[in-house]
Protein backbone atom coordinates (compact mmCIF):
# COMPACT_ATOMS: atom_id res chain seq x y z
CA UNK A 1 0.00 0.00 0.00
CA UNK A 2 1.04 3.57 -0.51
CA UNK A 3 -0.26 6.58 1.43
CA UNK A 4 -1.88 8.80 -1.21
CA UNK A 5 -3.21 11.59 1.00
CA UNK A 6 -3.03 12.55 4.66
CA UNK A 7 -6.19 14.16 6.09
CA UNK A 8 -5.70 16.41 9.12
CA UNK A 9 -8.15 17.93 11.60
CA UNK A 10 -7.01 21.42 10.62
CA UNK A 11 -7.62 21.02 6.87
CA UNK A 12 -10.31 18.31 6.67
CA UNK A 13 -11.91 18.23 10.12
CA UNK A 14 -10.76 14.69 10.95
CA UNK A 15 -7.60 12.58 11.12
CA UNK A 16 -7.24 9.89 8.40
CA UNK A 17 -5.04 8.49 5.65
CA UNK A 18 -6.05 7.61 2.10
CA UNK A 19 -4.35 4.41 0.93
CA UNK A 20 -3.77 3.26 -2.63
CA UNK A 21 -3.94 -0.50 -3.05
CA UNK A 22 -2.70 -2.82 -5.81
CA UNK A 23 -0.47 -0.88 -8.13
CA UNK A 24 -1.07 -1.10 -11.90
CA UNK A 25 1.65 -2.29 -14.23
CA UNK A 26 0.80 0.69 -16.48
CA UNK A 27 0.08 4.16 -15.16
CA UNK A 28 -1.80 4.87 -18.41
CA UNK A 29 -4.74 2.76 -17.15
CA UNK A 30 -5.60 5.39 -14.52
CA UNK A 31 -8.18 8.09 -15.36
CA UNK A 32 -6.71 11.59 -15.75
CA UNK A 33 -8.30 13.22 -12.65
CA UNK A 34 -7.18 10.32 -10.45
CA UNK A 35 -3.70 10.39 -12.02
CA UNK A 36 -3.22 14.00 -10.92
CA UNK A 37 -4.31 13.13 -7.38
CA UNK A 38 -1.93 10.15 -7.27
CA UNK A 39 0.99 12.09 -8.78
CA UNK A 40 1.11 14.39 -5.73
CA UNK A 41 1.86 11.34 -3.56
CA UNK A 42 4.37 9.87 -5.99
CA UNK A 43 2.14 6.86 -6.72
CA UNK A 44 1.97 6.04 -10.43
CA UNK A 45 -1.32 4.18 -10.54
CA UNK A 46 -3.43 2.19 -8.11
CA UNK A 47 -6.62 0.14 -8.52
CA UNK A 48 -8.34 1.05 -5.24
CA UNK A 49 -8.40 4.00 -2.88
CA UNK A 50 -9.43 3.35 0.73
CA UNK A 51 -9.60 5.82 3.58
CA UNK A 52 -8.85 4.78 7.15
CA UNK A 53 -9.43 6.89 10.25
CA UNK A 54 -6.42 7.29 12.51
CA UNK A 55 -6.37 7.11 16.28
CA UNK A 56 -4.00 8.83 18.68
CA UNK A 57 -0.32 8.09 18.12
CA UNK A 58 -0.57 7.34 14.38
CA UNK A 59 0.26 10.85 13.22
CA UNK A 60 3.67 10.09 11.66
CA UNK A 61 2.37 8.93 8.24
CA UNK A 62 2.61 11.27 5.25
CA UNK A 63 1.83 11.10 1.54
CA UNK A 64 4.20 8.82 -0.35
CA UNK A 65 4.95 6.50 2.59
CA UNK A 66 4.65 2.76 1.94
CA UNK A 67 2.95 0.35 4.32
CA UNK A 68 4.51 -3.11 4.17
CA UNK A 69 4.07 -6.40 6.04
CA UNK A 70 7.19 -5.59 8.07
CA UNK A 71 4.78 -3.87 10.49
CA UNK A 72 3.83 -7.36 11.75
CA UNK A 73 5.88 -10.17 13.24
CA UNK A 74 5.11 -13.85 13.96
CA UNK A 75 2.80 -14.53 16.95
CA UNK A 76 1.13 -11.10 16.57
CA UNK A 77 -2.67 -11.10 16.86
CA UNK A 78 -4.53 -9.44 13.97
CA UNK A 79 -8.09 -8.76 12.84
CA UNK A 80 -8.86 -9.48 9.16
CA UNK A 81 -11.70 -7.54 7.50
CA UNK A 82 -13.18 -8.56 4.15
CA UNK A 83 -16.39 -9.15 2.21
CA UNK A 84 -17.83 -12.65 2.69
CA UNK A 85 -18.58 -14.94 -0.25
CA UNK A 86 -21.92 -14.09 -1.85
CA UNK A 87 -24.51 -16.85 -2.09
CA UNK A 88 -27.09 -15.03 -4.22
CA UNK A 89 -30.82 -14.96 -3.54
CA UNK A 90 -31.60 -17.54 -0.86
CA UNK A 91 -34.88 -18.68 0.67
CA UNK A 92 -35.72 -18.73 4.37
CA UNK A 93 -34.67 -22.36 4.88
CA UNK A 94 -31.10 -21.71 3.71
CA UNK A 95 -30.80 -18.10 4.85
CA UNK A 96 -32.47 -18.21 8.30
CA UNK A 97 -32.55 -21.98 9.00
CA UNK A 98 -36.36 -22.23 9.04
CA UNK A 99 -37.60 -25.78 9.53
CA UNK A 100 -39.98 -25.93 6.58
CA UNK A 101 -42.99 -28.21 6.45
CA UNK A 102 -43.83 -31.85 5.87
CA UNK A 103 -42.25 -33.52 2.88
CA UNK A 104 -45.16 -35.85 2.17
CA UNK A 105 -48.65 -36.91 3.42
CA UNK A 106 -50.37 -34.45 1.13
CA UNK A 107 -48.54 -31.38 2.46
CA UNK A 108 -47.94 -28.58 -0.02
CA UNK A 109 -45.94 -26.50 2.49
CA UNK A 110 -42.28 -27.49 2.03
CA UNK A 111 -39.81 -24.58 2.07
CA UNK A 112 -42.18 -21.61 2.40
CA UNK A 113 -41.75 -19.04 5.22
CA UNK A 114 -45.25 -19.40 6.68
CA UNK A 115 -47.08 -16.48 8.27
CA UNK A 116 -45.38 -13.08 8.18
CA UNK A 117 -47.83 -11.21 10.41
CA UNK A 118 -51.39 -10.72 11.63
CA UNK A 119 -54.42 -9.53 9.66
CA UNK A 120 -56.32 -6.24 9.93
CA UNK A 121 -54.33 -5.17 12.95
CA UNK A 122 -51.53 -4.10 12.47
CA UNK A 123 -52.20 -4.36 8.68
CA UNK A 124 -48.49 -4.38 7.92
CA UNK A 125 -45.40 -6.54 8.16
CA UNK A 126 -43.10 -5.53 11.00
CA UNK A 127 -39.56 -4.39 10.09
CA UNK A 128 -36.87 -7.04 10.45
CA UNK A 129 -39.14 -9.94 9.47
CA UNK A 130 -36.96 -12.83 8.32
CA UNK A 131 -37.60 -13.47 4.63
CA UNK A 132 -35.77 -14.72 1.56
CA UNK A 133 -33.24 -12.36 -0.02
CA UNK A 134 -29.59 -11.67 -0.78
CA UNK A 135 -27.42 -13.93 1.38
CA UNK A 136 -23.91 -13.08 2.55
CA UNK A 137 -21.71 -10.72 0.48
CA UNK A 138 -21.32 -8.35 3.44
CA UNK A 139 -18.44 -6.96 5.48
CA UNK A 140 -17.06 -9.48 7.99
CA UNK A 141 -14.37 -9.07 10.66
CA UNK A 142 -12.55 -12.19 11.83
CA UNK A 143 -10.85 -11.37 15.12
CA UNK A 144 -7.67 -12.57 16.82
CA UNK A 145 -5.95 -14.50 14.05
CA UNK A 146 -2.33 -15.34 14.71
CA UNK A 147 0.42 -14.26 12.31
CA UNK A 148 2.36 -17.42 11.41
CA UNK A 149 4.95 -16.06 9.00
CA UNK A 150 5.96 -12.76 7.41
CA UNK A 151 7.53 -12.87 3.94
CA UNK A 152 9.11 -9.45 3.41
CA UNK A 153 10.51 -10.35 -0.03
CA UNK A 154 7.06 -10.89 -1.59
CA UNK A 155 5.20 -8.67 0.93
CA UNK A 156 3.01 -11.61 2.03
CA UNK A 157 1.48 -12.13 5.47
CA UNK A 158 0.45 -15.66 6.49
CA UNK A 159 -2.18 -16.04 9.21
CA UNK A 160 -3.65 -19.06 10.99
CA UNK A 161 -7.42 -19.31 10.66
CA UNK A 162 -10.33 -18.36 8.43
CA UNK A 163 -10.05 -15.32 6.17
CA UNK A 164 -13.33 -13.88 4.80
CA UNK A 165 -14.11 -13.77 1.10
CA UNK A 166 -13.39 -15.83 -2.01
CA UNK A 167 -9.88 -16.68 -3.20
CA UNK A 168 -8.12 -13.63 -4.61
CA UNK A 169 -10.25 -11.07 -2.75
CA UNK A 170 -8.75 -8.07 -0.97
CA UNK A 171 -8.74 -7.83 2.81
CA UNK A 172 -7.74 -5.28 5.43
CA UNK A 173 -5.39 -6.53 8.16
CA UNK A 174 -5.03 -4.55 11.39
CA UNK A 175 -3.61 -5.20 14.83
CA UNK A 176 -6.16 -6.93 17.08
CA UNK A 177 -8.13 -4.33 19.02
CA UNK A 178 -8.61 -6.48 22.14
Where are these regions (language model features)?
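Extended basic (Lys/Arg/His-rich) segments that typically form rRNA-contacting surfaces
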Residues: 1-178
